[in-house]
């Protein structure tokens, strides 16, 4: 069957989901029937076609009245403020991809369900009372038909959780720290301007800016045994896409750097193929732009100190990789629900 999808919020992730759907050749499995976005349809069409990070979209894009066309495919455009007013029942929507970055509670999910959607997938971490939080490649097999309201976690969680799992399974993690080196985001300023977070009052292109992160909580959601044993900090840097994560863990078993690299390389070629990649090329952040993997391990940066402290550097395209995982999780939800 073809999963009928509606997208709520057509920002960075919403637009990349549409692009990834067409570029990955999965249109026989997923069709986008509607997009709800408060911005005007002409702007939606323009930003789908032309993207500073990802270039021109290969498909023809045009807008006619309340429809957006990608090639010959017509997508209904909505501008509803209220979730309760969305016509998901009328449109036969199977899964809503809520990409607003604003909604994430069970109440918000239930509003989509009340409007007629069968399932809801949030493109960001949700509240603890959601039916499931998925990092595709790690725990999607735990999805059940009764799971209606699901979170796809965050781009950084999708990046680091597979690597943590691999290291923990192999060597037994005792504790860890994570530093996220994240590209600038829309909640930062072009030039100095007011913001509740005083660090984010400063021009994004001129500084490395520390910001709050809930990544440690995201890690312990998947690995409760690490409660109070993982900490995370984050900085934003003056690039517009791609993120690096510096992961340091202490482990129970003694290990060498080449053994860590061999473990991660084999995983990239085997059980985590398509989710984790591995490289020893002398690459920089822009080289990972438009990479569909959740995580790319940079083997040249792996270090081991005292046989028990492992440091790794993991890259991800925080937009493109995550958009591809949204599609993967959508299909996983549909597979268990509609078979």
Swiss-Prot record:
The record marks 182 as: Activates thiol group during catalysis. The active site is at 155 (nucleophile). The keyword NAD applies. Its EC number is 1.2.1.72. It is found in: Cytoplasm. The keyword Cytoplasm applies. Its main location: cytoplasm. One of its GO terms (cellular component) is cytoplasm. It catalyses: D-erythrose 4-phosphate + NAD(+) + H2O = 4-phospho-D-erythronate + NADH + 2 H(+). Substrate binds at residues 154-156, 200, 213-214, 236. GO terms for biological process: pyridoxal phosphate biosynthetic process; pyridoxine biosynthetic process. Keywords: Cytoplasm, NAD, Oxidoreductase, Pyridoxine biosynthesis. It is an enzyme of class 1 (oxidoreductase). InterPro entries: E4P_DH_bac (IPR006422), GlycerAld/Erythrose_P_DH (IPR020831), GlycerAld_3-P_DH_AS (IPR020830), GlycerAld_3-P_DH_cat (IPR020829), GlycerAld_3-P_DH_NAD(P)-bd (IPR020828), NAD(P)-bd_dom_sf (IPR036291). GO terms for molecular function: erythrose-4-phosphate dehydrogenase activity; NAD binding. NAD(+) binds at residues 12-13, 318. Pathway: Cofactor biosynthesis; pyridoxine 5'-phosphate biosynthesis; pyridoxine 5'-phosphate from D-erythrose 4-phosphate: step 1/5. Homotetramer. Catalyzes the NAD-dependent conversion of D-erythrose 4-phosphate to 4-phosphoerythronate. Belongs to the glyceraldehyde-3-phosphate dehydrogenase family. Epd subfamily. HAMAP family: E4P_dehydrog. This is D-erythrose-4-phosphate dehydrogenase. It comes from Escherichia coli O7:K1 (strain IAI39 / ExPEC).
């Amino acid at each position: 069957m073809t999963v009928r999808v509606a997208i709520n919020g057509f920002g960075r992730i919403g637009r990349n989901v549409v692009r990834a759907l067409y570029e990955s050749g999965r249109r026989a499995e997923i069709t986008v029937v509607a997009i709800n976005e408060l911005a005007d349809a002409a702007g939606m069409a323009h930003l789908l076609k032309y993207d500073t990070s990802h270039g021109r979209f290969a498909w023809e894009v045009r807008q006619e009245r309340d429809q957006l066309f990608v090639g010959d495919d017509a997508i209904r455009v909505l501008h509803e403020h209220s979730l309760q007013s969305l016509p998901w029942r009328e449109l036969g929507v199977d899964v809503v991809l809520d990409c607003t970055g604003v909604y994430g509670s069970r109440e918000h999910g239930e509003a989509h369900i009340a409007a007629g959607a069968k399932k809801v997938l949030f493109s960001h971490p949700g509240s603890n009372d959601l039916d499931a939080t998925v990092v595709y490649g790690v725990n999607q097999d735990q999805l059940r038909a009764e799971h209606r309201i699901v979170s796809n976690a965050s781009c950084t969680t999708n990046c680091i959780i597979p690597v943590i799992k691999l290291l923990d399974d192999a060597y037994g993690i005792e504790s860890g720290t994570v530093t996220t080196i994240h590209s600038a985001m829309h909640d930062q300023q072009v030039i100095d301007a007011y913001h509740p977070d005083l660090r984010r009052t400063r021009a994004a292109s001129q500084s490395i800016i520390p910001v709050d992160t809930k990544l440690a909580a995201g890690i312990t959601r998947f690995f409760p045994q690490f409660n109070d044993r993982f900490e995370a900090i984050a900085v934003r840097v003056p690039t517009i896409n791609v993120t690096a994560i510096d992961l340091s863990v202490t482990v129970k078993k003694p290990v060498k750097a080449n053994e860590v690299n061999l473990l991660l390389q084999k995983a990239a070629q085997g059980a985590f193929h398509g989710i984790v990649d591995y490289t020893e090329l002398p690459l920089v952040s822009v080289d990972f732009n438009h990479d569909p993997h959740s995580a790319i391990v940079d083997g040249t940066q792996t270090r081991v100190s005292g046989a028990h402290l492992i440091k790794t550097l993991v890259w991800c395209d925080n937009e493109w990789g995550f958009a591809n995982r949204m599609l993967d999780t959508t299909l996983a939800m549909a597979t268990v629900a509609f078979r």
